[in-house]
């Protein structure tokens, strides 16, 4: 009931008839999970949302994937955070959308949400050797969008210049598969 009321209020405030995507951010508590999923299904059936999804991580997100009722999933993925790589492929085979967060490893070390461990793996794997004139962020973004089953990636930004650089980088397209394979090989060697 709270989910449905919240969506109705949002629709009124947004002055629209439906949401494009409605997703859980994190797993609902186990005791409310079935009811919460049914609420999303009801909202979709009633035309209040076009698509439903879940934003979570393994292992929790696997339960929702197994339900086979969701249109999209959001989770982290990059060269430095590849835990969900095979899940992206699996979802692509099911025709389910994937929204990637953390596609450039959550930013620069020492700023924002960056994980120094991830960037330490970059250094251990000597990935700077593969940059070929790119900076690390362009390289990571282009690596992320190289996954053939990925639907889209969400890139956070601290300023408009970041947005311009990210759009330019994405416009250059994915990295060569041979480069991506070398990244995976090097990172596996330091894992």
Question: Residues of each region from the PLM?
Answer:
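Glycine/proline-rich, positively charged
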Residues: 1-79, 86, 96, 146
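Generic, ordered loop/turn and secondary-structure boundary motif
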Residues: 80-81, 105
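Structured C-terminal cap/extension of enzyme domains
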Residues: 86-191
């Amino acid at each position: 009931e709270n989910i449905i009321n919240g969506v109705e209020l949002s629709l009124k405030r947004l002055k629209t008839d439906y949401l494009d995507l409605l997703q859980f951010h994190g797993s609902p508590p186990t005791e409310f999970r079935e009811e919460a999923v049914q609420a999303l299904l009801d909202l979709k059936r009633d035309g209040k949302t076009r698509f439903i999804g879940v934003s979570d991580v393994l292992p929790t997100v696997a339960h929702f994937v197994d339900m086979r009722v969701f249109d999209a999933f959001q989770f982290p993925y990059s060269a430095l955070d590849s835990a969900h790589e095979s899940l992206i492929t699996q979802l692509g085979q099911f025709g389910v959308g994937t929204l990637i967060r953390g596609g450039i490893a959550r930013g620069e070390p020492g700023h924002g949400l960056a994980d120094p461990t991830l960037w330490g793996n970059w250094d251990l794997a000597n990935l700077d050797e593969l940059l070929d004139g790119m900076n690390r962020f362009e390289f990571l973004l282009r690596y992320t969008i190289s996954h053939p089953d990925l639907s889209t990636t969400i890139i956070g930004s601290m300023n408009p210049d970041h947005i311009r650089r990210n759009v330019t980088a994405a416009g250059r397209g994915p990295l060569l598969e041979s480069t991506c394979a070398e990244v995976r090989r090097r990172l596996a060697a330091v894992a």
